[in-house]
Amino acid sequence: MLDENEKLVSLPVSHRDHRTDGYLEKAASIVGLERLHFDTGAQLLEINSIFQLLAIVDNTPDELVRAKYLQLMPDLIMHALTGEIGTEYTIATTTGLYDTQENQWAYGLAKDLGIPMHFFGEVEDAGSIRGVLSEDIQAKTGLGPLRCIATTSHDTASAVVATPLESPGSAYISSGTWSLMGVEIDSPITNEITLHERLTNEGGFDRSIRLLRNITGLWIIQEVRRDLKSQGIEINYVDLVAAAKAQSDPWRTLFFVDAPVFVYAGGMIARIQQYARETGQPVPETPGEIAQATFASLALQYAHTADVLAECSGLAMPAIHIVGGGAQNEHLSQMTADVSNKEVITGPIEATAIGNAIVQAITTGAIADIGSARALISSSDMKFGTYQPTTDSSAREQIKAVRNRYEELIAHQRVTD
Protein backbone atom coordinates (compact mmCIF):
# COMPACT_ATOMS: atom_id res chain seq x y z
CA MET A 1 0.00 0.00 0.00
CA LEU A 2 1.14 3.54 -0.79
CA ASP A 3 0.42 6.73 1.12
CA GLU A 4 -0.65 10.10 -0.29
CA ASN A 5 2.95 10.75 -1.34
CA GLU A 6 3.03 7.40 -3.17
CA LYS A 7 5.51 5.97 -0.67
CA LEU A 8 5.24 2.50 0.87
CA VAL A 9 3.16 2.43 4.04
CA SER A 10 5.01 -0.74 5.07
CA LEU A 11 7.21 -3.33 3.43
CA PRO A 12 5.49 -6.09 1.41
CA VAL A 13 5.00 -9.40 3.22
CA SER A 14 5.42 -12.90 1.77
CA HIS A 15 2.16 -14.62 0.90
CA ARG A 16 3.36 -17.59 2.98
CA ASP A 17 3.64 -15.46 6.12
CA HIS A 18 1.70 -16.85 9.08
CA ARG A 19 -0.12 -13.58 9.72
CA THR A 20 -3.16 -14.89 7.80
CA ASP A 21 -3.48 -18.09 9.85
CA GLY A 22 -7.12 -18.51 10.88
CA TYR A 23 -8.45 -15.63 8.80
CA LEU A 24 -10.31 -17.82 6.32
CA GLU A 25 -12.26 -19.27 9.22
CA LYS A 26 -12.80 -15.80 10.69
CA ALA A 27 -14.14 -14.42 7.41
CA ALA A 28 -16.37 -17.46 6.98
CA SER A 29 -17.81 -16.92 10.47
CA ILE A 30 -18.83 -13.40 9.41
CA VAL A 31 -20.20 -13.87 5.89
CA GLY A 32 -20.07 -17.64 5.24
CA LEU A 33 -17.85 -19.73 2.98
CA GLU A 34 -20.44 -19.64 0.22
CA ARG A 35 -20.45 -15.87 -0.05
CA LEU A 36 -16.65 -15.65 -0.02
CA HIS A 37 -16.65 -17.88 -3.10
CA PHE A 38 -19.87 -16.94 -4.89
CA ASP A 39 -19.36 -13.15 -4.65
CA THR A 40 -15.93 -13.38 -6.27
CA GLY A 41 -15.52 -16.78 -7.91
CA ALA A 42 -12.24 -17.14 -6.03
CA GLN A 43 -10.63 -20.19 -4.49
CA LEU A 44 -10.58 -19.93 -0.72
CA LEU A 45 -6.89 -19.74 0.16
CA GLU A 46 -5.50 -17.99 3.22
CA ILE A 47 -2.72 -16.51 1.09
CA ASN A 48 -5.25 -14.38 -0.83
CA SER A 49 -5.18 -10.59 -0.53
CA ILE A 50 -8.58 -10.55 1.18
CA PHE A 51 -7.13 -12.37 4.18
CA GLN A 52 -3.91 -10.34 4.12
CA LEU A 53 -6.06 -7.22 4.44
CA LEU A 54 -8.14 -8.74 7.22
CA ALA A 55 -4.93 -9.45 9.13
CA ILE A 56 -3.92 -5.81 8.69
CA VAL A 57 -7.36 -4.63 9.88
CA ASP A 58 -6.85 -6.56 13.12
CA ASN A 59 -3.14 -6.08 13.75
CA THR A 60 -1.89 -2.87 12.11
CA PRO A 61 -5.02 -0.81 11.32
CA ASP A 62 -3.02 2.43 11.24
CA GLU A 63 -1.59 1.27 7.90
CA LEU A 64 -5.07 1.36 6.39
CA VAL A 65 -5.61 4.91 7.60
CA ARG A 66 -2.39 6.07 5.94
CA ALA A 67 -2.96 4.09 2.74
CA LYS A 68 -4.27 5.95 -0.30
CA TYR A 69 -3.46 3.41 -3.02
CA LEU A 70 -3.39 -0.37 -3.10
CA GLN A 71 -0.76 -1.66 -5.50
CA LEU A 72 -0.52 -5.40 -6.06
CA MET A 73 3.05 -6.56 -6.65
CA PRO A 74 3.10 -6.28 -10.48
CA ASP A 75 1.49 -2.86 -10.24
CA LEU A 76 3.98 -1.79 -7.56
CA ILE A 77 6.84 -2.72 -9.91
CA MET A 78 5.15 -0.79 -12.70
CA HIS A 79 4.83 2.20 -10.36
CA ALA A 80 8.56 2.01 -9.67
CA LEU A 81 9.23 2.11 -13.42
CA THR A 82 6.72 4.76 -14.46
CA GLY A 83 5.46 6.58 -11.40
CA GLU A 84 1.93 5.70 -12.52
CA ILE A 85 -0.76 4.15 -10.32
CA GLY A 86 -2.90 1.36 -11.77
CA THR A 87 -4.44 -2.07 -11.26
CA GLU A 88 -4.27 -4.74 -13.96
CA TYR A 89 -7.20 -7.13 -14.44
CA THR A 90 -5.60 -10.59 -14.18
CA ILE A 91 -3.83 -9.87 -10.90
CA ALA A 92 -6.92 -8.13 -9.46
CA THR A 93 -8.96 -11.30 -9.94
CA THR A 94 -6.61 -13.27 -7.66
CA THR A 95 -7.30 -11.10 -4.60
CA GLY A 96 -10.54 -12.72 -3.44
CA LEU A 97 -12.08 -9.24 -3.56
CA TYR A 98 -12.91 -8.96 -7.27
CA ASP A 99 -16.35 -9.91 -8.60
CA THR A 100 -15.59 -11.74 -11.85
CA GLN A 101 -19.29 -11.90 -12.77
CA GLU A 102 -19.83 -8.14 -12.57
CA ASN A 103 -16.25 -7.18 -13.47
CA GLN A 104 -15.81 -4.88 -10.51
CA TRP A 105 -14.49 -4.92 -6.96
CA ALA A 106 -16.72 -6.81 -4.50
CA TYR A 107 -17.53 -3.69 -2.49
CA GLY A 108 -20.38 -5.23 -0.50
CA LEU A 109 -18.29 -8.19 0.61
CA ALA A 110 -15.42 -5.95 1.66
CA LYS A 111 -17.75 -3.66 3.61
CA ASP A 112 -19.31 -6.55 5.51
CA LEU A 113 -15.84 -7.84 6.43
CA GLY A 114 -14.71 -4.41 7.62
CA ILE A 115 -12.16 -3.95 4.84
CA PRO A 116 -11.96 -0.33 3.63
CA MET A 117 -12.01 0.07 -0.15
CA HIS A 118 -10.95 3.70 -0.56
CA PHE A 119 -7.53 2.64 -1.86
CA PHE A 120 -8.84 0.29 -4.58
CA GLY A 121 -8.54 1.85 -8.02
CA GLU A 122 -10.01 1.31 -11.46
CA VAL A 123 -9.08 -1.99 -13.09
CA GLU A 124 -7.54 -1.88 -16.56
CA ASP A 125 -7.26 -4.59 -19.20
CA ALA A 126 -4.13 -6.64 -19.70
CA GLY A 127 -2.21 -5.06 -22.54
CA SER A 128 -2.97 -1.48 -21.49
CA ILE A 129 -0.15 1.04 -21.78
CA ARG A 130 0.44 2.25 -18.22
CA GLY A 131 2.88 5.00 -19.15
CA VAL A 132 6.52 5.50 -20.06
CA LEU A 133 9.71 4.99 -18.10
CA SER A 134 10.14 7.78 -15.58
CA GLU A 135 12.86 10.35 -16.16
CA ASP A 136 14.76 8.95 -13.18
CA ILE A 137 14.78 5.41 -14.63
CA GLN A 138 15.71 6.78 -18.05
CA ALA A 139 18.69 8.58 -16.52
CA LYS A 140 19.83 5.50 -14.57
CA THR A 141 19.52 3.08 -17.48
CA GLY A 142 20.31 5.24 -20.48
CA LEU A 143 17.02 4.19 -22.04
CA GLY A 144 14.57 6.56 -23.64
CA PRO A 145 10.87 7.09 -22.87
CA LEU A 146 9.92 3.47 -23.50
CA ARG A 147 6.25 2.56 -23.22
CA CYS A 148 5.43 0.31 -20.25
CA ILE A 149 2.65 -2.18 -20.89
CA ALA A 150 0.58 -3.69 -18.09
CA THR A 151 0.74 -7.22 -19.44
CA THR A 152 -1.09 -10.27 -18.07
CA SER A 153 0.69 -9.57 -14.82
CA HIS A 154 -0.37 -12.68 -12.92
CA ASP A 155 2.35 -15.12 -13.95
CA THR A 156 -0.07 -17.96 -14.66
CA ALA A 157 -2.17 -15.72 -16.89
CA SER A 158 0.95 -15.02 -18.95
CA ALA A 159 1.88 -18.71 -19.00
CA VAL A 160 -1.56 -19.64 -20.35
CA VAL A 161 -1.24 -17.07 -23.14
CA ALA A 162 1.84 -19.01 -24.31
CA THR A 163 0.24 -22.46 -23.96
CA PRO A 164 -0.53 -23.90 -27.43
CA LEU A 165 -4.02 -25.16 -26.61
CA GLU A 166 -4.69 -26.53 -30.07
CA SER A 167 -7.41 -29.03 -29.09
CA PRO A 168 -10.56 -27.23 -27.85
CA GLY A 169 -11.23 -27.90 -24.19
CA SER A 170 -7.71 -29.03 -23.33
CA ALA A 171 -6.44 -28.34 -19.83
CA TYR A 172 -3.19 -26.69 -18.81
CA ILE A 173 -0.89 -27.03 -15.84
CA SER A 174 1.50 -24.18 -15.17
CA SER A 175 4.00 -26.26 -13.24
CA GLY A 176 6.48 -24.77 -10.82
CA THR A 177 6.38 -24.01 -7.11
CA TRP A 178 2.62 -24.11 -7.55
CA SER A 179 0.79 -26.28 -10.06
CA LEU A 180 -2.04 -24.19 -11.45
CA MET A 181 -4.36 -26.45 -13.41
CA GLY A 182 -7.31 -25.19 -15.37
CA VAL A 183 -9.24 -24.58 -18.56
CA GLU A 184 -10.13 -21.45 -20.51
CA ILE A 185 -13.82 -20.49 -20.44
CA ASP A 186 -15.83 -17.45 -21.49
CA SER A 187 -17.56 -16.62 -18.20
CA PRO A 188 -17.17 -17.55 -14.52
CA ILE A 189 -18.61 -20.76 -13.10
CA THR A 190 -19.54 -20.97 -9.43
CA ASN A 191 -21.49 -23.75 -7.77
CA GLU A 192 -21.21 -26.18 -4.88
CA ILE A 193 -18.60 -28.20 -6.76
CA THR A 194 -16.34 -25.22 -7.46
CA LEU A 195 -16.65 -24.20 -3.80
CA HIS A 196 -15.85 -27.56 -2.25
CA GLU A 197 -13.22 -28.54 -4.83
CA ARG A 198 -11.40 -25.22 -4.32
CA LEU A 199 -11.69 -24.00 -7.91
CA THR A 200 -11.17 -20.36 -8.78
CA ASN A 201 -12.21 -18.09 -11.62
CA GLU A 202 -9.22 -15.93 -12.52
CA GLY A 203 -8.91 -13.43 -15.31
CA GLY A 204 -7.07 -14.08 -18.53
CA PHE A 205 -6.10 -12.08 -21.57
CA ASP A 206 -8.95 -10.23 -23.30
CA ARG A 207 -11.11 -10.64 -20.18
CA SER A 208 -11.32 -14.40 -20.59
CA ILE A 209 -11.73 -16.59 -17.50
CA ARG A 210 -9.40 -19.33 -16.35
CA LEU A 211 -11.30 -21.88 -14.27
CA LEU A 212 -8.53 -23.49 -12.27
CA ARG A 213 -7.24 -24.90 -9.04
CA ASN A 214 -4.11 -23.73 -7.28
CA ILE A 215 -2.41 -27.00 -6.38
CA THR A 216 0.64 -27.07 -4.14
CA GLY A 217 3.28 -28.11 -6.65
CA LEU A 218 7.01 -28.68 -6.81
CA TRP A 219 7.40 -26.50 -3.74
CA ILE A 220 7.16 -29.78 -1.84
CA ILE A 221 10.08 -31.37 -3.68
CA GLN A 222 12.09 -28.15 -3.33
CA GLU A 223 11.56 -28.30 0.42
CA VAL A 224 12.40 -32.03 0.49
CA ARG A 225 15.70 -31.28 -1.21
CA ARG A 226 16.37 -28.46 1.25
CA ASP A 227 15.68 -30.82 4.16
CA LEU A 228 18.04 -33.42 2.69
CA LYS A 229 20.76 -30.79 2.33
CA SER A 230 20.36 -29.83 5.99
CA GLN A 231 20.96 -33.51 6.80
CA GLY A 232 24.17 -33.49 4.77
CA ILE A 233 22.64 -35.22 1.73
CA GLU A 234 23.42 -33.34 -1.48
CA ILE A 235 21.27 -34.51 -4.39
CA ASN A 236 20.30 -32.62 -7.53
CA TYR A 237 16.83 -32.72 -9.08
CA VAL A 238 17.84 -35.07 -11.89
CA ASP A 239 19.16 -37.67 -9.45
CA LEU A 240 16.17 -37.20 -7.14
CA VAL A 241 13.77 -37.89 -10.03
CA ALA A 242 15.86 -40.93 -11.02
CA ALA A 243 15.69 -42.26 -7.45
CA ALA A 244 11.93 -41.79 -7.46
CA LYS A 245 11.54 -43.55 -10.80
CA ALA A 246 13.55 -46.52 -9.51
CA GLN A 247 11.02 -47.36 -6.79
CA SER A 248 9.50 -50.82 -7.21
CA ASP A 249 6.08 -49.71 -5.94
CA PRO A 250 5.32 -46.23 -7.31
CA TRP A 251 2.04 -45.97 -5.35
CA ARG A 252 3.36 -47.14 -1.97
CA THR A 253 2.65 -43.91 -0.08
CA LEU A 254 0.24 -41.14 -1.09
CA PHE A 255 -0.69 -37.83 0.48
CA PHE A 256 -2.95 -34.85 -0.18
CA VAL A 257 -0.57 -32.22 -1.52
CA ASP A 258 -2.99 -29.39 -0.70
CA ALA A 259 -3.18 -30.17 3.00
CA PRO A 260 -2.27 -26.99 4.91
CA VAL A 261 0.65 -28.77 6.60
CA PHE A 262 2.57 -28.71 3.30
CA VAL A 263 2.24 -24.97 2.65
CA TYR A 264 5.00 -23.66 4.90
CA ALA A 265 8.76 -23.95 4.76
CA GLY A 266 10.86 -26.25 6.90
CA GLY A 267 10.50 -29.84 8.07
CA MET A 268 8.78 -31.07 4.90
CA ILE A 269 10.12 -34.63 5.12
CA ALA A 270 8.95 -35.00 8.72
CA ARG A 271 5.50 -33.73 7.77
CA ILE A 272 5.19 -36.18 4.86
CA GLN A 273 6.24 -39.00 7.18
CA GLN A 274 3.77 -37.93 9.86
CA TYR A 275 0.97 -37.80 7.28
CA ALA A 276 1.83 -41.38 6.27
CA ARG A 277 1.70 -42.54 9.90
CA GLU A 278 -1.62 -40.82 10.56
CA THR A 279 -3.19 -42.40 7.47
CA GLY A 280 -1.82 -45.89 8.10
CA GLN A 281 0.56 -45.98 5.14
CA PRO A 282 4.20 -47.08 4.85
CA VAL A 283 6.46 -44.27 6.01
CA PRO A 284 8.85 -43.14 3.25
CA GLU A 285 12.44 -43.03 4.50
CA THR A 286 14.86 -42.78 1.58
CA PRO A 287 15.13 -39.79 -0.79
CA GLY A 288 13.70 -41.94 -3.58
CA GLU A 289 10.71 -43.06 -1.51
CA ILE A 290 9.96 -39.51 -0.39
CA ALA A 291 10.29 -38.06 -3.89
CA GLN A 292 8.16 -40.81 -5.45
CA ALA A 293 5.42 -40.31 -2.86
CA THR A 294 5.41 -36.64 -3.84
CA PHE A 295 5.31 -37.20 -7.61
CA ALA A 296 2.65 -39.91 -7.33
CA SER A 297 0.49 -37.67 -5.15
CA LEU A 298 0.88 -34.74 -7.54
CA ALA A 299 -0.08 -36.86 -10.56
CA LEU A 300 -3.15 -38.19 -8.76
CA GLN A 301 -4.21 -34.69 -7.72
CA TYR A 302 -3.84 -33.57 -11.34
CA ALA A 303 -6.06 -36.44 -12.49
CA HIS A 304 -8.63 -35.67 -9.80
CA THR A 305 -8.66 -32.00 -10.77
CA ALA A 306 -8.99 -32.84 -14.46
CA ASP A 307 -12.16 -34.79 -13.71
CA VAL A 308 -13.58 -31.94 -11.63
CA LEU A 309 -12.78 -29.33 -14.28
CA ALA A 310 -14.41 -31.44 -16.98
CA GLU A 311 -17.52 -31.90 -14.85
CA CYS A 312 -17.86 -28.19 -14.07
CA SER A 313 -17.05 -26.85 -17.54
CA GLY A 314 -18.59 -29.54 -19.71
CA LEU A 315 -15.39 -29.61 -21.77
CA ALA A 316 -14.15 -32.89 -23.23
CA MET A 317 -10.54 -32.24 -22.20
CA PRO A 318 -8.72 -34.37 -24.80
CA ALA A 319 -5.26 -33.41 -23.53
CA ILE A 320 -3.34 -31.79 -20.70
CA HIS A 321 -0.62 -29.24 -21.51
CA ILE A 322 2.15 -28.82 -18.93
CA VAL A 323 4.19 -25.62 -19.19
CA GLY A 324 6.83 -24.02 -17.00
CA GLY A 325 9.83 -25.52 -15.27
CA GLY A 326 7.95 -28.61 -14.13
CA ALA A 327 7.45 -29.61 -17.77
CA GLN A 328 11.06 -30.84 -17.69
CA ASN A 329 10.12 -33.65 -15.27
CA GLU A 330 9.48 -36.48 -17.72
CA HIS A 331 8.69 -38.95 -14.94
CA LEU A 332 5.89 -36.75 -13.53
CA SER A 333 4.56 -36.05 -17.03
CA GLN A 334 4.29 -39.76 -17.83
CA MET A 335 2.64 -40.52 -14.49
CA THR A 336 0.15 -37.71 -15.15
CA ALA A 337 -0.70 -39.20 -18.55
CA ASP A 338 -1.13 -42.65 -17.02
CA VAL A 339 -3.36 -41.74 -14.08
CA SER A 340 -5.48 -39.22 -16.02
CA ASN A 341 -5.69 -41.49 -19.08
CA LYS A 342 -5.09 -38.43 -21.25
CA GLU A 343 -2.39 -37.31 -23.64
CA VAL A 344 0.09 -34.97 -21.96
CA ILE A 345 1.93 -32.35 -24.00
CA THR A 346 4.80 -30.46 -22.39
CA GLY A 347 6.30 -27.08 -23.25
CA PRO A 348 7.20 -24.34 -23.56
CA ILE A 349 9.29 -24.25 -20.41
CA GLU A 350 9.55 -20.45 -20.26
CA ALA A 351 5.82 -19.96 -20.84
CA THR A 352 5.40 -17.05 -18.42
CA ALA A 353 8.11 -14.92 -20.05
CA ILE A 354 6.89 -15.83 -23.54
CA GLY A 355 3.28 -15.01 -22.68
CA ASN A 356 4.34 -11.68 -21.22
CA ALA A 357 6.14 -10.84 -24.47
CA ILE A 358 3.17 -11.99 -26.57
CA VAL A 359 0.77 -9.60 -24.81
CA GLN A 360 3.19 -6.75 -25.44
CA ALA A 361 3.51 -7.83 -29.09
CA ILE A 362 -0.28 -7.87 -29.51
CA THR A 363 -0.56 -4.43 -27.90
CA THR A 364 2.05 -2.96 -30.25
CA GLY A 365 0.59 -4.70 -33.32
CA ALA A 366 3.51 -7.05 -33.93
CA ILE A 367 1.21 -10.08 -33.53
CA ALA A 368 -2.44 -10.04 -34.54
CA ASP A 369 -4.03 -12.00 -31.70
CA ILE A 370 -3.57 -14.82 -29.21
CA GLY A 371 -4.50 -17.48 -31.77
CA SER A 372 -1.75 -16.30 -34.10
CA ALA A 373 0.69 -16.24 -31.20
CA ARG A 374 -0.09 -19.81 -30.17
CA ALA A 375 0.24 -21.01 -33.77
CA LEU A 376 3.63 -19.31 -33.91
CA ILE A 377 4.72 -21.11 -30.74
CA SER A 378 3.52 -24.49 -32.02
CA SER A 379 5.49 -24.12 -35.25
CA SER A 380 8.65 -22.93 -33.50
CA ASP A 381 11.72 -24.99 -32.62
CA MET A 382 10.94 -24.80 -28.89
CA LYS A 383 11.23 -28.12 -27.07
CA PHE A 384 7.94 -29.99 -26.71
CA GLY A 385 7.21 -33.46 -25.40
CA THR A 386 4.28 -35.85 -25.79
CA TYR A 387 3.29 -38.59 -23.37
CA GLN A 388 0.60 -41.18 -24.02
CA PRO A 389 -1.21 -43.03 -21.23
CA THR A 390 -0.37 -46.68 -20.78
CA THR A 391 -2.68 -49.12 -22.54
CA ASP A 392 -1.45 -52.17 -20.63
CA SER A 393 -4.54 -53.79 -19.11
CA SER A 394 -2.92 -54.82 -15.83
CA ALA A 395 -1.39 -51.36 -15.39
CA ARG A 396 -4.77 -49.75 -16.03
CA GLU A 397 -6.39 -51.98 -13.41
CA GLN A 398 -3.70 -51.03 -10.90
CA ILE A 399 -4.18 -47.34 -11.68
CA LYS A 400 -7.94 -47.67 -11.21
CA ALA A 401 -7.37 -49.16 -7.76
CA VAL A 402 -4.83 -46.46 -6.86
CA ARG A 403 -7.19 -43.70 -7.96
CA ASN A 404 -9.97 -45.15 -5.81
CA ARG A 405 -7.56 -45.30 -2.88
CA TYR A 406 -6.55 -41.67 -3.43
CA GLU A 407 -10.17 -40.52 -3.64
CA GLU A 408 -10.87 -42.20 -0.31
CA LEU A 409 -7.79 -40.52 1.17
CA ILE A 410 -8.90 -37.00 0.20
CA ALA A 411 -12.68 -37.45 0.49
CA HIS A 412 -12.96 -35.54 3.77
CA GLN A 413 -10.49 -32.81 2.86
CA ARG A 414 -12.57 -29.96 1.49
CA VAL A 415 -12.35 -26.16 1.55
CA THR A 416 -11.07 -25.42 5.06
CA ASP A 417 -9.12 -28.62 5.71
Predicted regions and their residues:
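Short, glycine/charge-rich flexible loops or terminal/linker lids adjacent to PRPP-binding catalytic cores
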Residues: 17, 131-134
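Short alpha-helix plus adjacent loop in nuclease-associated cores
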Residues: 13-30, 358
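Short beta-strand to alpha-helix junction loop
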Residues: 101-102, 126-130
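Short beta-strand-loop/turn "lid" adjacent to the catalytic site in phosphate-handling enzymes
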Residues: 1-15, 43-47, 78-99, 122-125
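A conserved helix-loop-beta module that forms one wall/lid of the active-site cleft
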Residues: 107, 113-126, 357
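Active-site core segments that coordinate phosphate-bearing ligands/cofactors
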Residues: 28-46, 50-84, 97-107, 111-112, ...
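Pocket-flanking alpha-helical
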Residues: 1, 22-26, 159-161
